[in-house]
Amino acid sequence: MQKTIISVKNLQKSYGTFEAVKGISFDVYEGEIFGLLGPNGAGKSTTLEIIETLRDKTSGEVMVDGMNLDNEPDNIKKIIGVQLQSSGFYPGLTLLELIRLFAGLYNRPVQPMELLKLVNLEDKAKSKYKELSGGQKQRFSIATTLINQPKIVFLDEPTTGLDPQARRNLWDLIKDIRSKGATVIITTHYMDEAEQLCDRIAILDEGKIIALASPDKLIDDLVATGFERPKQVKAANLEDVFINLTGKEIREE
C-alpha cells in the first residue's frame, strides 16, 4: 500500500465573499509526481501555496508527512523545496554565489557544482543569473529547491513561457528528481505536460476538484463513453516537427 505523504481534507480559502478554493480533498502518495491541472483562476496556485505554508487557509486540514500544518509549519518547511520565481533571485550574482547564499539560509552544507551538474548548468557556474536564458533560469530555480534535500518538491507552472525543447528538458529533470526519491507536486495548465509527467492529476475548475485519477484512467473513462476525436491522431505533432528541425538536444536553451 502506498504511503500518503500529503493529505488535504475540506480545504477552503476565501477572500472576502470570493471562494478561491471550495472545500477540496485529495491525497498525494510518497514518490509520485502529482499534478494540479486547470485553467487560470482554478485555485491551483492558491492550493499549492497553502500546503507550502506560504498562504493561510480559511478552513480545512492539511497534513504533510504526518505533520499538521496548523501546529508544525516550521517543521514542514524543513522537508519541502519550493521553486522561486525569477524575482526571488539577485540578478547580479553568479549561480555559485546564489547557491551559497541559499545554503546559508538553510544552514546546510552544499556542493554547488553537484547541484549545477544535476540541472546541466555546471558550465554556467560563474555566469550571473541575469545572463541565463529562460530555460536555464527555470532549471536553476529547480536546483535551488533541492538545496535542503527535500522530501517534497513543489513546482508552480514550471514550464510557462518556455519553448518546446526547453519544456521537454525540464520534464526530464523533474522525472530525474522523482527517481532520486522525492515526491513532486506541480501545477500546470498544459494538458500534454500533465499527461507526460504525472502519475495522477487532480483537475480543478472554479475552486473545485472535478476529477482525480491517473491520466490514462481519465482518458480511458472518456473513451468508454463513446467519445472520439474529430480527426485521426497522427504519429507525430507540430511540436515534434519543431524540435526535430531545431536540433533537439543540440539546441541551446
Label each PLM-derived region with a short phrase.
Residues 153-157:
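Catalytic Walker B motif of ABC-type/P-loop ATPase nucleotide-binding domains
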